[in-house]
Amino acid sequence: GEVRGFVYDKSTSEPVLFTTVFLDGTNFGISTDINGYFSITKVPAGTYTLKVSSVEYADFNKEITIQANKIITERIELEESNVQLDEVTISGKKIAAQENIQVAISTVKPREIKIMPSVGGEPDLAQYIQTLPGVVFTGDQGGQLYIRGGSPVQNLILLDGLLVYNPFHSIGLFSIFDTDILKNVDIYTGGFNAEYGGRTSAVIDVTTKDGNKNRFSGKVSANPFTSKLTLEGPITKKENGGGTSFVLSGRTSYLDRTSEVFYDYVETENGLPYSFNDIYGKVTSTSSQGSKFSAYGFNFSDRAGLDSSSTFGWDQYGVGAQFIFLPSGSSQLISGTAGYSSYDIGIQEATQSPRSSQVSSFNFGLDFTYFISKSEIKWGIQYVGNSTSYNTVTPNRIVIEENQNNTEMAGYGKVRFVQSRFVIEPSLRLQYYASLGLLSLEPRIGGKLNITDDFRFKAAGGYFTQNLIATRSDRDVVNLFAGYISSPGSLFDENRQSVEDKIQKSTHYIAGFELDLFRDKVEINVEPYIKIFNQNININRLKVFADDPDFIVEEGQSSGVDFQ
């Protein structure tokens, strides 16, 4: 038989993530996923005590009866607890550590961001992410993020499954993500599985909460930099636990006005010339069984006055929808995402011609997940159609204009095998670049060996490709403007020979270990890594004549050891 369901916070009806659900006295157990979902399969018929343990919540116990070839669906609500962790909770954390590979990934919860000292009293992901190993952040030089040697354009940024092209404001202290509406942030610094594609370095996967389904609440805050308003609450309620809820967040900055008062030592004519506005809204409808549908939208903008005669700015907006469907009588979970996003950027300088760029994308994905005992099979299809434009004039007065439409299609599959002492997750991605007529076969693998209960060895690796190119050279650290284009029609290597394969490529190798000390009170994580950038495409800074190539091919390698 099978027992499955969702785990929720009783006070808000928000899903409880990554908590351990198990049958007491057995080896049957699993952690909830990003949606609070769990599925324990292949359970012999009988009566069991279903237990849920979590760091933040009181333990949950319920007696259930499982019948052969039958599926039980449970809706579990946990109450918050301030009681010190007991052995059951510690055991749950240990199970999760042993059964989740966790190579080159940092999972960030909102509470971790909020307890960290922040600039201006406003906790933000942009400030937190700088504390992570392997991350280099340029801060007030445009907020560019370099992860284990990869450039910013090589990072895949997702907001509720929607493509985002610039997650940080120009001042660098703030991201576009309001901490009060975040549910979870997964940061993959390398070696990510085949579920993610189209980028060669890293992934930042941001998920927002659905909104409080039980009561209305709001928050107004202000500091010398920004002010914001957050609202959430139920739209409709159902006695059986389902309903519709919303969450709305708006934030504006006024640093360009307040800096003249608070920071009079700044040697600029009009204080600090930065301003931005962020708006995000989401509506979610959930059934009593846990299936749900969400619709959301955002609008982010940023402005910077570089000097009295230069202006810079970008606008980013998008709309999308997600669903989770739990078929009755089936051991699978079906989920999907569809949406449209757009990013426009421009700069006007007194000594140069205007530069501008625009990228817009429609993306669609459909995923199927099957649970077999502790193991998992997941596969899906993805589609991205984008258009890019880039307009600039070089210092030598050569006009560069690039306008392209591209289509990327992908299918992936991954299998996670969980045994008593090891976990292995091979995956494969087929990425088709329709505009280039190129099919890329991208194998990935990750694994963990539990040498003892407290010492675990882990490793991951894979092959990655991408088509998107940034017009900012990696050698320009201080440069707010970055246009986006797809692979150019003509491309040459250092010997001026034509390059037929016009995608960017990288290979990742990661290995390391985890060590728990003093009854799990101290956790040590060490990860050596190598990223080989087999083919990078960069703007040609040495272009002098019209027939010189606009872009050149480069190679690179990044290596190091991360301690956490």
Language-model regions, residue ranges each:
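Periplasm-facing N-terminal accessory domains of Gram-negative outer-membrane beta-barrel systems
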Residues: 1-87
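Periplasmic N-terminal accessory/gating domains of Gram-negative outer-membrane beta-barrel systems
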Residues: 58, 65-70, 91, 95-153, ...
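Surface-exposed extracellular loop regions of Gram-negative outer-membrane beta-barrel proteins
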Residues: 199, 250-254, 292, 331-350, ...
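Transmembrane beta-barrel wall of Gram-negative outer-membrane proteins
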Residues: 225-254, 265-303, 311-335, 370-377
